[in-house]
Amino acid sequence: MLQVSEMWQKNDIFRDLLFHQPLLDVATSLIGPNVQLFHDQALYKPSKIGGAVPWHQDNGYWRCQPAELISICIALDDADTTNSCMNVLPGSHLEKPHNHSRAKQEQQELPSLLSVEVDESQSVSIPLKSGYAMVHHCLTLHRQIQTGQTKTVEPW
């Protein structure tokens, strides 16, 4: 998986998308009129080796206080249960921040990924068509699982 940050500074089309009025309207309806861009990223997941993103809260990385940020995830390709759509734990944003540990995969620590243990029986998949978006609070527990898809996806 490849993560590219600060896309709005590198690409005019991406910048125009991030500052598109309908997205700003969604953000202001949720957090009020003082909207600021805190962080952006694009995730590129090559087929079959795209990698998983373990359960985490975005604020586990950001550590902002107060934790009053949202993420708007825009699907650049169709994302469903066969190719790494987002999974969330509904209502988890109402809980206190979780302690995150470094993610592990095949007995290796992944220093750039955080992870938290959750009750997966309550998780919900959020499939998105290309061009659609989902919004979640920075304390919402979410993940993307690794799949054996044969198509390269650029979901976020």
Question: Would you name each region that the model predicts?
Answer:
Residues 67-71, 83, 123-125, 155:
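Extracellular structured ligand-interaction cores
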